[in-house]
Amino acid sequence: MNAIPLEHGLAVAGVLFCLGLVGLMVRRNILFVLMSLEIMMNASALAFVVAGSRWAQPDGQVMFILVISLAAAEASIGLAILMQLYRRFHTLDIDAASEMRG
């Protein structure tokens, strides 16, 4: 089976990570921020898998499973926080939710 070259896989992972980072910095909607975090975590998982396949080591796949389980935990906790913020402030805007009310 022919695998993709290491440079191409890491380039795709880098582009995905940068896209997630831009989405994290630009967006103010907490749902899009969570999606950007997921993209960044998946990009790092892709880098682990590509590097592991390059040297024929299973460590990349083990790290992929770890990253996916962390992403699932982050998504469930993040969505629970998102629902509570929406119930309390009636918005998903990060700036509006961060204002202190006395």
Swiss-Prot record:
Recorded catalytic activity of this chain's protein: a quinone + NADH + 5 H(+)(in) = a quinol + NAD(+) + 4 H(+)(out)
A GO term, aspect molecular function: NADH:ubiquinone reductase (non-electrogenic) activity
Enzyme class, spelled out: translocase
GO aspect biological process, one term: ATP synthesis coupled electron transport
E.C. designation(s): 7.1.1.-
Gene Ontology CC terms, in alphabetical order: NADH dehydrogenase complex; plasma membrane
Keywords: Cell inner membrane, Cell membrane, Membrane, NAD, Quinone, Translocase, Transmembrane, Transmembrane helix, Transport, Ubiquinone
Annotated TM spans: 6-26, 30-50, 62-82
Membrane topology reported for the UniProt record: Multi-pass membrane protein
Subcellular location: Cell inner membrane
InterPro entries the UniProt entry points to: NADH_UbQ_OxRdtase_chain4L/K (IPR001133), NUOK/Mnh_C1-like (IPR039428)
Pfam family, one: Oxidored_q2
Role played: NDH-1 shuttles electrons from NADH, via FMN and iron-sulfur (Fe-S) centers, to quinones in the respiratory chain. The immediate electron acceptor for the enzyme in this species is believed to be ubiquinone. Couples the redox reaction to proton translocation (for every two electrons transferred, four hydrogen ions are translocated across the cytoplasmic membrane), and thus conserves the redox energy in a proton gradient.
Family the entry assigns: Belongs to the complex I subunit 4L family.
HAMAP family: NDH1_NuoK
Assembly information from the UniProt record: NDH-1 is composed of 13 different subunits. Subunits NuoA, H, J, K, L, M, N constitute the membrane sector of the complex.
Protein name (record): NADH-quinone oxidoreductase subunit K
Organism of this sequence: Pseudomonas savastanoi pv. phaseolicola (strain 1448A / Race 6) (Pseudomonas syringae pv. phaseolicola (strain 1448A / Race 6))
